[in-house]
Design a protein with these regions (language model features):
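Conserved strand-loop elements at the edges of beta-sheets that form or border functional pockets
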Residues: 3, 17, 40, 48, ...
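Single conserved hydrophobic/aromatic residue that forms the stacking wall/gate
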Residues: 1-6, 10
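Conserved, short, structured surface segments that act as functional micro-motifs
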Residues: 91-133
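Soluble periplasmic/extracytoplasmic beta-strand elements of cell-envelope proteins
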Residues: 16, 22-24, 35-37, 66-68, ...
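Short, well-structured beta-strand-loop connectors
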Residues: 45-54, 87-102
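Short glycine/threonine/proline-enriched tight-turn/helix- or strand-capping micro-motif at secondary-structure
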Residues: 20-48
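Zn2+-dependent peptidoglycan hydrolase active-site motif and core
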Residues: 49-86, 112-113
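Residue-level recognition of beta-strand microenvironments
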Residues: 26, 57-58, 85, 102-105
């Protein structure tokens, strides 16, 4: 349901691929994997997928350096396991703007990659339905 509504809204948006690399793990709610993993070179730029405001820029033991961006139309994007963060909470960002660098941070990381999540109205949606990786 959320995915269908998200699709309708997203058709009117310009989305940027969050980093260069290859998909190494897919969105799978059954496995509680609420994002797409993109294997990438360390220090590759992580880009905001759309315009928005950074609401989270922090470090956690499990997910390492994490940045979250609130977008219009009730969308949120989350970027985990970064090597470093380039923006702080409250910063306005443009779609395609570098917000972090790819890394291997956090105990759940298995190598240099970006774990990218997309949420619509509080529900995870499959990023691969909206962005060509």
């Amino acid at each position: 349901l959320a995915s269908s509504a998200a699709s309708d809204v997203y058709k009117r948006q310009i989305l940027y691929r969050p980093t260069r690399g290859m998909v190494s793990d897919h969105f799978n709610t059954d496995k509680k994997h609420f994002g797409t993993d993109i294997a990438a070179n360390p220090n590759e730029s992580v880009l905001a997928t759309m315009d928005g405001t950074v609401f989270l820029s922090t470090y956690t033991a499990e997910t390492g350096y994490v940045i979250g961006v609130q977008h219009s139309q009730d969308f949120v994007s989350i970027y985990k396991h970064c090597g470093s963060l380039l923006k702080k909470e409250g910063d306005r960002v443009k779609g395609g703007e570098a917000i972090a660098l790819v890394g291997n941070s956090g105990t759940l990381s298995t190598g240099p990659h970006l774990h990218f999540e997309l949420w619509y109205k509080g529900h995870p949606v499959n990023p691969e339905k909206y962005i060509v990786f």
